[in-house]
Each structure stands twice: as C-alpha cells, then as structure tokens.
C-alpha cells in the first residue's frame, strides 16, 4: 500500500467511479451487469440481519451503496438507512428507485471519512460491502466505519481475497469466461487478504466476531455462504462497549 495517503476528502479512485457511472442506468436490471449483486443480496442481507440481531428500528449506514440494492433491502427490514457513495449517477438511480418503490432511504454523496467527521457513533449498524477493493486507501475506510458505529454496534465488511485462486475466479472466470461482470471491474492488486483487513480492524474499537466465505457454483449457478475465504468473504465485527 502507498505510504502517501490521499486526504480523507479524496479517498476516491476516479477511474473506479467512472466504471460504475457508465453502467448506473442498468443498476436495477436483474439480467444486466449487476445481476451478481442482485443474486447475492439475499445472502448478504440474511447474514447482516442474523448477525446483528435484526434490523428493525435500527439506524444503518451503507457505505459504497451504489444504486441502493442492499440499502433498500435493509430499509424493507424496518431500518432507518443512509446510503453513502461518491458516484453521482448511481445515487440518482438509487433515489429514483426509492421514489418508485416507496422505500425511504437517505442517499448522500460524500466519502465515509467526511461522514465520520460529522456523524461519529451515530449508527447501530454500518455495512461496507464490495467497496474496499475500489478505493485507494481501504484502511482509512475501515477506521472511518469504526468511528461511525455506536459502542456495541455492528460493522460488516465484504471484499475479495488476494491470491491466485481469487484472480482466476473473480477476474478470469467472472469477467472473461462467464461474463458475469464487465471486463475491468476488478484489479487483483486491490484485493485484500483477510489478515490485512483484520489488522486494520484491530487498530480500531472493532473486534472480529465472525468471518465466512461467499461461494459460487458455476455448475448449479448458485451462491452460498460457508467455510473458506479464498475468494469472496464477509466479516462481522462489533464495537467495544462504552
């Protein structure tokens, strides 16, 4: 990782933003570029809901919300949800979708570091899913998420492990062979080993509670959670009590 860190207001890779801006209009197309996100969302939502003891009545922040797939589903569970993203077009899509579906979600265009400076310890649950591998300084994002959650609150991360298998599965397989996501979506150099993510967590008030893998079976075309964090994985952490 670069020793020279971007400022908190600019922990943004504009090339990454441009990728998602270009396809934002198709965010809610169940057969489009974001089909895998729609497919895994019930697993993500179930994991978050179960591990946090339910979302009803809780204040939730979704960091890197994109077009709002996870944010909207958490709002449907009865949470008061704020979605953060630096992409203008994805947020416009998310806002329009919320109006059409009658689901109330507040969408904000700012970095998580900027949000943490104004809203420290204000959320019961913070989610940061499939986002860390798209920013210049993921460690800074982890720290900001820790600042945003209330004492004894829950923070969830998901990302991709960095190894040969994840390159084969997430880049070669998903982008070039199965064409599940657009070519160039992922850069294996930006993938994050679980040990790296856990070391950043240990620098904060957060403590690891559970880690699980997210697995795809190309034969049955299904996803499931289970042991093994070689490729995609999700991490549940909890903030220390006050």
Curated annotation (Swiss-Prot):
According to UniProt, the reaction catalysed is:
a 3-demethylubiquinol + S-adenosyl-L-methionine = a ubiquinol + S-adenosyl-L-homocysteine + H(+); a 3-(all-trans-polyprenyl)benzene-1,2-diol + S-adenosyl-L-methionine = a 2-methoxy-6-(all-trans-polyprenyl)phenol + S-adenosyl-L-homocysteine + H(+)
* Residue numbers binding S-adenosyl-L-methionine: 44, 64, 85, 129
Q: Which SUPFAM superfamilies match?
A: S-adenosyl-L-methionine-dependent methyltransferases
Domain of life, per the record?
A: Bacteria
As for what it does, the entry says: O-methyltransferase that catalyzes the 2 O-methylation steps in the ubiquinone biosynthetic pathway.
The Swiss-Prot or TrEMBL record describes its family as follows:
Belongs to the methyltransferase superfamily. UbiG/COQ3 family.
Check the record and name the NCBIfam families matching this protein: UbiG (TIGR01983)
Write the protein's name: Ubiquinone biosynthesis O-methyltransferase
Species:
Salmonella paratyphi A (strain AKU_12601)
What gene does the UniProt entry assign to this protein?
A: ubiG
